[in-house]
């Protein structure tokens, strides 16, 4: 999903939420659980690699914001160089953390104004939150969505999808996706 967002927008940088977990690839193994010494100020967290071996350039391409802080997201997107904002609409890897009323609507508005794709990570909430996942339950439509555990029924499976205008970049071969 992140590669697709980068291919569609022509931008390299991404924004994620501090404490958000989106798998074990370099771009998202940033600030999953940074030490308090490394985390930086609460309103402007630092991008902290969670493992050795993550290239410095990757860390520089990831900005981190606090969950439920739309002002911080606005600042992170202001330079106009961000391909996507990836977020769990309901954060579950730090406990069940619901979005504040109006937060996701603000996120949708901010990302649209900045030409940044909004990716909902519904690996856990995709079906478990109800029909249509948290996306349907909370009423905010992302550009792309990732699914896995919630659709697997115990089997290791992953998927992503989204609006045709973005997914067509895979169909026409301008963005490669295999696997």
Where are these regions (language model features)?
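Conserved N-terminal phosphate-binding loop of PLP-dependent enzymes in the Aspartate aminotransferase
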Residues: 2-179
């Amino acid at each position: 999903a992140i590669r697709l967002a980068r291919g569609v927008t022509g931008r390299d940088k991404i924004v994620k939420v501090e404490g958000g977990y989106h798998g074990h690839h370099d771009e998202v193994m940033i600030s999953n659980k940074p030490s308090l010494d490394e985390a930086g100020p609460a309103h402007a967290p630092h991008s902290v690699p969670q493992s050795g071996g993550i290239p410095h350039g990757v860390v520089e391409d990831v900005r981190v914001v606090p969950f439920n802080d739309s002002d911080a997201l606005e600042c992170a997107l202001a330079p106009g160089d961000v391909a996507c904002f990836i977020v769990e609409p309901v954060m579950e890897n730090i406990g069940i953390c619901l979005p504040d009323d109006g937060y996701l609507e603000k996120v949708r508005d901010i990302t649209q104004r900045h030409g940044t794709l909004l990716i909902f990570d519904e690996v856990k909430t995709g079906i478990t939150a109800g029909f249509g996942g948290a996306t349907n339950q909370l009423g905010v439509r992302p550009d792309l969505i990732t699914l896995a555990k919630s659709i697997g029924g115990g089997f290791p499976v992953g998927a992503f999808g989204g609006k045709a205008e973005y997914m067509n970049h895979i169909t026409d071969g301008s963005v490669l996706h295999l696997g």
